[in-house]
Amino acid sequence: MAVYVNSTTGPPPSVGRNSAGFHPSIWGDKFITSSNSAVQKTDVDRKEEEKLQLLKQEVKKMLTAGDTSQQDLICLIDDIQRLGLSYHFEAEIDTLLQHVKHSYVEHYGKKNHDNLHDVALSFRLLRQEGHNISSDVFSKFQDSDGKFKEELVEDVRGMLSLFEAAHLRVHGENILEDALEFTTTHLNSYLNSNPSSSLADLVRRALKYPLRKSFNRMVARHYISVYHKFDWHKQVLLDMAKCDFNLVQKVHQNELGYITRWWKDLDFTNKLPFARDRVVECYFWITGVYFEPRYAAPRKFLTEVMSLTSIIDDIYDVYGTPDELVQLADAIDKWDISILDQLPEYVRHAYKPLLDTFAEAEEEMANEGLPTYGVDYAKEAFKRLAVAYLQETKWLQAQYIPTFEEYLSVALVSAGGNMLSVSSFVRMGNIATREAFEWLSKDPLIANGLSVIIRLSDDIVGHEFESQRPHIPSAVECYMKSHDVTKETAYAELQKPIIKAWKDMNEGCLHPEAPPKPLLERVLNLARVLNFLYDGHDGYTHSSTRTKDIITTAFINPIPL
C-alpha cells in the first residue's frame, strides 16, 4: 500500500503493489476431473449403499436392545461417535443419553462406583449434548488432600476418558483443571514407557488433538484405522464406518467438483493473481463444520462465502491502495450491484461474485418456501467485517501499533468468526429462526470465544511469515508493545485467552437461552477445524505440505474395505 491513488479502471502500472508471495493452488483441476467420474452411481456404489443400510439396522438393534447394561451402552455410543456414524442414530442416542442424565447422580454419584472410565465417559457424553451436569462426581477419585489418587494411573483407558472429559470444563471447575494436569502428565509418561501398546495411538492422538477440539472427519478416519486393535471393538461398527466414510467421501468429491468449477469460471487465478487460491482448502474447512450429506446446501453456501472472504481479505491485506479500500468498504456497505462500474476493475471481480452468492442463496431459499431473513443478517455481518478490515489498513498506513485492548476491539471482528457463524446458519432451514440470528448478533459467549480463537491462533502462527512484508499489526506486536515483552513471551501469554475462549465456548453450549444444538455445533465446529489447520503453522495459507496430506486423506483416498 505504498502509493495513495484513486483508480476506477484497474490499477495502472505505476502503482506500487505489495505481494505476499502466496503459493498457487496445488490442486489444479484434480477435483473437476475426479467428480466427472464419480457423479454417476455405479453398481458398486448401489451395493455399498445397500450394505450400509443393512449394517445400520444391525447397529440400531444394538442401541435399542433392552438387555444391554448402561456401561456397555455409553461405550457403544462413544464408538459410534468416534467412527463418524452418530448422524445415522441421532434419535436413538438422544433417548439413551436422556436416560443416562436422569440417573446420573444416582448411578455415578455413589462412592462405590469407582470405574473412572465409566464415570468420565458418561460425563463427557452428557456435556457434549449440552447437559449441565456437575463435575463434583469426580471428587471420589481424589484423596483426603484433594489430589487425584495415584492408583488411577494404572487405568490408562480411564485416564484417557478423564483427560477428554476435562476439555469440556467451564470457568471455576478447579477439579477438572486438576484432572487435566494430572492426566496430561501421566499419559505422556505412559507414552514414553509404552510407545507401541494398543492404546498408544489413541493416547498420542488425544494429547495432540483432544476430541473436544477435533472435527468429525479426521476423528473418524483415525479411529477407523486403530479401532480393530482394541478388545472392545465390534466388527459391525467397523464395517459400517468404512462403508459410510467412503460413501460420504464420494458426496464430497462431487460437491468439490462443482465448487472447483464455480471457482475456475470466476478465473481469480488470472484476474486476481495476488490472492490466495484456496477454494479446496475452504471446502475442507467447511466439511468440518458440517460433513453430513444432508447439509449440502449450507456447505456450498458457506464454502463460497469463505472463499470470497479470503479474496477480499487479501485485497485489504496485500494489494489495495487506501482509496481503493475505502471504495470497497463503501460498496460492501451499500450492497448494490448498480455501483459495480464505479469500482476499480480488479475489485469488481470480487464484488460481483460476493453479491451473486448471497442473491442466489436468497432465491433458492425463497423457491424452497423458506424465510430469507438469514441472508440479511449475514450481509450485515459482512459489512461489519469490511469496516474492521478498513480500520486495520488505516493502522498500517499510519504505521500505528494500537494497544492490545484497542487491537482486539477491531480484530475480533476482522477475524471473521461472527460473519462465518451467521453465514453457517443461513441455509440450515427452519431450525435457524429469527431468534437464533438475534441471539448470535449479540455476540454470545460461544461466538465471542470463536472470534478469540480464530484471531489469536491466526496471529500466532502467521506472525513470522507476515513480518516479512508490510502488514497490519497483529496481536503479537500489540501485546509486545503494551506489555514490553519479547515475542516468545507474547506467544505464551496469548495462549491464555485462547484457553479461556474454549471454556467460554463450553459454557455457551450449556446456556439455557442458547439455540438448538445443531446450530451451536456449527460455531463450535468452525473452531475445531481451525484448531486442526493452525497446528503450529497456518495450514490454510501454506497448504502444500501437511494440509495437502490431510485433504488427500479426506477427499481422495478411500478406506480399504
From Swiss-Prot:
List of residues binding Mg(2+) 3: 458, 466
Keyword Repressor (UniProt): no
GO MF entry, a single one: magnesium ion binding
GO biological process: diterpenoid biosynthetic process
Cofactor(s) recorded in Swiss-Prot or TrEMBL: Mn(2+); Mg(2+)
Motif (DDXXD motif): 313-317
Location of this chain's protein in the cell: Cytoplasm
Signal peptide stretch: none
Primary location recorded for the protein, binned into one broad class: cytoplasm
Binding of Mg(2+) 2, residues: 313, 317
Cofactor details (free text): Binds 3 manganese or magnesium ions per subunit.
Key words, A-Z: Cytoplasm, Lyase, Magnesium, Manganese, Metal-binding
PANTHER family per record: (-)-GERMACRENE D SYNTHASE (PTHR31225:SF221), OS04G0344100 PROTEIN-RELATED (PTHR31225)
Family to which this protein belongs: Belongs to the terpene synthase family. Tpsa subfamily.
Domain comment, as recorded: The Asp-Asp-Xaa-Xaa-Asp/Glu (DDXXD/E) motif is important for the catalytic activity, presumably through binding to Mg(2+).
Annotated protein name in UniProt: Sesquiterpene synthase 1
Gene: STS1
